[in-house]
């Protein structure tokens, strides 16, 4: 209802009396909650670690040893509880998670999302290739991997029935290098049988892209599609080396891209051409933090990096080349477009009614206060609402996020925390 409507004052009084009206403090603004399309949940424990080494070395020296520890449910509980709390505090109301190969720990992540009020999409990871995975961290057999995936789907769908904001099981082959053909085929069949979401990595780096070409004689996207893993509910992370045919295939199958600009800068070997994917090929794209290949849990940080990376792609980075050949024309995106990816784009990628403050969409919001003494966003008299909006996108910190709501329920309250601490 609009303030100038005849019934406005009456409706307002009724809502206040029913305690369904909350008046925001001055200099507060509502933004949709963020949708993070790519989070390696166990890797929260190593965020900010060894980002200066190649991907293959990073996985085998740091990541796989860490993820193997999630056989310990106590350790998993500690890490996952802290992660979900941190993501909510950073305005992330929906997250698409890679867990680990461990059934119990993966289920516990889903339960924590349900308990804390975050909309979580959780995948128990499959890594069954005996030759490509370390002996200490892999599925013992392909049959076991597929059976546990099916049981996980069934259990999380049952949990979802009693979870207001929703939790969702996700078919999750880690990436083609870690899986046998039998597993990839079986996972595609499970995705079709249960009509659930799918996630994996696709053409992430020179190493991964070339690995798939050598193994199958085709690009990652084409191989994944052959196994039934590109669908309307599929989200593929990175996609930095997609060719024209791959982009067309993503559009035709409805497959979305999780753009992870911070982690791509460390491990991606290239800048993903987001403007081309969205504007020329109509591929659905959202943002991902890619913890811990990306060091920050904040999509504010990632949307800024998305803009920076796109401008570097358009302008080029080799100063010895002439401007006309140095970069890629029309590759840049604006900060407004990056915000769209972090909200609406993520909702579209997941085929869920989230990411907008509109009728028919879930009430997922973050309340931003710009006038806090410890995190003040500067003002300029007479500036437009658009100017303030862009300042928030560039300058907001977790301290500015005072409240977070998911599906109409308050799940994070910085004001209450500050009052409790006497701040």
Where are these regions (language model features)?
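Alpha-helical scaffold segments that flank or form the walls of functional sites
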Residues: 29, 47-118, 147-163
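Histidine-centered catalytic micro-motifs
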Residues: 32-44, 197-206
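Active-site gating loops and adjacent loop-to-helix segments of metal-dependent hydrolytic enzymes
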Residues: 45-76, 129-142, 206-231, 253-256, ...
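Metal-coordinating catalytic core of metallo-dependent amide/deamination hydrolases
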Residues: 104, 109-240
């Amino acid at each position: 209802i609009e303030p100038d409507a005849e019934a406005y004052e009456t409706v307002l009084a009724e809502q206040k009396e029913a305690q369904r009206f909350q008046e925001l403090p001055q200099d507060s603004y509502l933004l949709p909650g963020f949708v993070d399309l790519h989070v390696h949940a166990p890797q929260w424990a190593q965020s900010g670690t060894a980002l200066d080494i190649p991907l293959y070395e990073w996985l085998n020296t740091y990541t796989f040893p860490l993820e193997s520890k999630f056989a310990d449910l106590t350790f998993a509980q500690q890490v996952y509880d802290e992660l979900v709390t941190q993501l909510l505090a950073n305005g992330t109301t929906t997250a698409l998670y890679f867990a680990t190969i461990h059934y119990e720990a993966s289920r516990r992540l889903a339960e924590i999302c349900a308990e804390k009020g975050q909309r979580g999409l959780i995948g128990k990871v499959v890594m069954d290739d005996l030759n490509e995975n370390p002996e200490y961290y892999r599925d013992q057999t392909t049959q076991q991997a597929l059976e546990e995936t099916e049981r996980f789907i069934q259990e999380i769908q049952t949990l979802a029935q009693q979870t207001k904001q929703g939790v969702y099981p996700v078919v999750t082959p880690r990436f083609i290098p870690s899986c046998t053909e039998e597993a990839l085929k079986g996972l595609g069949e499970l995705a079709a049988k249960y009509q659930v979401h799918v996630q994996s990595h696709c053409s992430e780096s020179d190493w991964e892209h070339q690995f798939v070409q050598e193994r199958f004689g085709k690009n990652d996207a084409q191989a994944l599609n052959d196994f039934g893993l590109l669908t309307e509910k599929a989200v593929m992370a990175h996609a930095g080396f997609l060719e024209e045919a791959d982009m067309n295939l993503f559009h035709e199958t409805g497959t979305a891209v999780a753009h992870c600009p911070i982690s791509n800068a460390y491990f991606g070997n290239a800048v993903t051409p987001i403007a081309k994917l969205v504007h020329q090929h109509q591929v659905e794209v959202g943002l991902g933090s890619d913890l811990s290949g990306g060091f920050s849990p904040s999509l504010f940080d990632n949307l800024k990096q998305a803009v920076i990376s796109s401008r570097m792609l358009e302008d080029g980075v080799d100063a010895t080349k002439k401007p006309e050949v140095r970069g890629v024309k029309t590759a840049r995106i604006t900060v407004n477009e990056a915000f769209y990816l972090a909200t609406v784009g993520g909702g579209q990628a997941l085929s869920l009614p989230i990411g907008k403050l509109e009728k028919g969409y879930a009430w997922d919001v973050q309340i931003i206060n710009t006038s806090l003494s410890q995190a003040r966003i500067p003002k300029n008299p007479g500036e437009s609402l658009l100017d303030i909006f862009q300042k928030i996108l560039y300058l907001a910190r977790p301290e500015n996020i005072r409240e977070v709501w998911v599906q109409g329920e308050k799940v994070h309250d910085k004001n209450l925390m500050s009052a409790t601490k006497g701040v």
